[in-house]
Amino acid sequence: ADPSLDYSQVTRPRALPLLTEFETSKGKEWLWTTFSADQIDLNFSNPKVLLTMLEVLLNYVKHGARFIRLDAIGFLWKKIGTTCMHLPETHQVVQLMRAVLNLAAPQVQLITETNVPHLDNISYFGNGKNEAQFVYNFSLPPLTAHAILRQDASYLSQWAAGITPPSS
């Protein structure tokens, strides 16, 4: 990554540096670290990285995975001059993963995880057949726990009534 570029439009989930300098076999390099310096982002625009991650995906399947969660997927693709959130290329990578799984292991389900507004979250269903089979919803677990513990589902019901189904 080039620290001289303008990254002001990039959505930041944390108030930590977006780029971190690391010592590599090629000398010092700046790497993209969306969440923190201990979590380096992968460059999915590099075909070698993309193919390696597809191999990792299939290795999970080989070892019995039935559900695969794509954590913070909205941040996957980097494009200077954008928010770097929910870019078309990100959806294309999810579609590619789904296509690979449909061929190699159709029983395996993809779950996308994005802590974002509902409509952005459900965009990872794609057309209903080409992206994730499930999207993780951050509001649902605490509201469900609250309803069970309080024996009162009013907050859960109120929240659910405001959700637009993906088919709408």
Regions inferred by a protein language model and the residue ranges of each:
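Short, charge-rich amphipathic segments
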Residues: 20-38, 89-95, 123-139
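Substrate-binding/active-site clefts of carbohydrate-active enzymes
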Residues: 1-63, 76-78, 82
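Conserved alpha/beta catalytic core and glycan-binding cleft of carbohydrate-active enzymes
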Residues: 1-9, 103-168
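Active-site neighborhood of glycoside hydrolase catalytic domains
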Residues: 41-121, 125-129, 142, 146-147
